[in-house]
Amino acid sequence: MEEDNLEIRKSNISGKGVFAKKLIKKGEKICFMEGEEVSVEEFIRRIKEGIEKDGDFLQVDNEKYIDMKESNRCINHSCNPNAFIRGKNELVALKDINKGEEIAYDYSTTMWEDKDEIKKELGTDAWTMKCKGGSKNCRKIIDQFYLLPKDLQKYYIKNKLAPDFILKKSAKN
């Protein structure tokens, strides 16, 4: 995390959040979502064994995840995001983010899992959660990209506001 530009503190969204310490301009890199890259099998093992929670991971390819470092885990979700993931794991400002403003991205733009495989292994759907953001356009549930409303999927795809693997999968479907 770019500690010079960001700070972690109590969030109005949920738990801790990441906040801008200076103005971050639209299109500017905020940070890389860093951690250990693991396979889907390792992702499942760590969750089953209670080593990690499913929200500790960022999906970066069909069967690859990053077990994010603690500071990246503090970046909250919003249905009205001011940031997005570009490429593989680069968090970028979607619009100008003012000093003191919390940074949040739409978690649904980073998930496209084989729910049947995950459910079989874990006994539950992976990574479906209630939204706590409270924005006017709140969807109430955070889930897979392909389950987003079609108009929102089209917006994210057209504007390339999702990781490369999501954009590639969307082009095939």
Outline where the language-model segments fall.
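Conserved catalytic SET/PR domain of SAM-dependent protein methyltransferases, capturing the structural core
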Residues: 1-173
